[in-house]
Amino acid sequence: MWLGDYSLLNLLGIFLQATFIQNILLSTFLGMCSYLACSSRLSTANGLGMSVALVLTITGSINWLVHYFITKPGALAWLSPALANIDLSFLELIMFIVVIAAFTQILEVLLERFSRNLYLALGIFLPLIAVNCAILGGVLFGITRNYPFLPMVVFSLGSGCGWWLAIVLFATIREKLAYSDVPQHLRGTGISFITTGLMAMAFMGLTGIDISKPTTSKPAFVTNIATDSPQPNTHSSSEEPKAS
């Protein structure tokens, strides 16, 4: 339940796959609003990316517990066998959003207290983390893949770091584009989408690398060797046939 059949190598594979191969922003284009709005300066993009990664990691872990112990059909059986037939799955999305919104509010209070400059730089986009579809999408992706708890934590961390990496790279490029001779009709949104598309194509080059699946069975060649090997002769060579 907590680790399942996943090894440490599989956990590393899940992290790399969520960060690079299946980057939640560049492969599914979730969270594009804040990605485009808060990437004009590298410092602001870095702060927002760090916040999204933190919120996604913690809320992904909490929502996994919500799914398996509250909203999943039969999840309440751990409280009492009489509650095994209760199905609260219709409340799942609402509870996921409530958890994300609550933790976002906590993060907003902490940033206002300890990082006033970042709090002012993010502005209205900080409370909008609560409705950032990348966070809810990362949670739902992990739940639908039936990850155990630790792989879910690693997947949430990788998805958050992938979004963070994408917005930091994009902010770096946008700072360079500010001093470039971009055609007038492509300035602003046009060159931003072109740049994002080229970044997505670059990350697609890693497609095919997959070490995230658990190995629950022996390799095929081991099975073939076991089945093709000659069976030992159980009859003694000195045994004579019986007379009819």
UniProtKB/Swiss-Prot annotation:
It is found in: Cell inner membrane. One of its GO terms (cellular component) is Gram-negative-bacterium-type cell wall. One of its GO terms (molecular function) is oxidoreductase activity, acting on NAD(P)H, quinone or similar compound as acceptor. It catalyses: a ubiquinone + n Na(+)(in) + NADH + H(+) = a ubiquinol + n Na(+)(out) + NAD(+). The chain crosses the membrane at residues 11-31, 50-70, 90-110, 123-143, 153-173, 191-211. Its EC number is 7.2.1.1. Residues 222-236 have a biased composition (Polar residues). Keywords: Cell inner membrane, Cell membrane, Ion transport, Membrane, NAD, Sodium, Sodium transport, Translocase, Transmembrane, Transmembrane helix, Transport, Ubiquinone. GO terms for biological process: respiratory electron transport chain; sodium ion transport. Pfam families: Rnf-Nqr. The keyword Ion transport applies. It is a multi-pass membrane protein. InterPro entries: NqrDE/RnfAE (IPR003667), NqrDE/RnfAE_oxidrdctase (IPR050133), NqrE (IPR010967). Residues 222-244 are annotated as: Disordered. The keyword RNA-binding does not apply. NQR complex catalyzes the reduction of ubiquinone-1 to ubiquinol by two successive reactions, coupled with the transport of Na(+) ions from the cytoplasm to the periplasm. NqrA to NqrE are probably involved in the second step, the conversion of ubisemiquinone to ubiquinol. Composed of six subunits; NqrA, NqrB, NqrC, NqrD, NqrE and NqrF. Belongs to the NqrDE/RnfAE family. This is Na(+)-translocating NADH-quinone reductase subunit E. It comes from Chlamydia trachomatis serovar D (strain ATCC VR-885 / DSM 19411 / UW-3/Cx). The gene is nqrE.
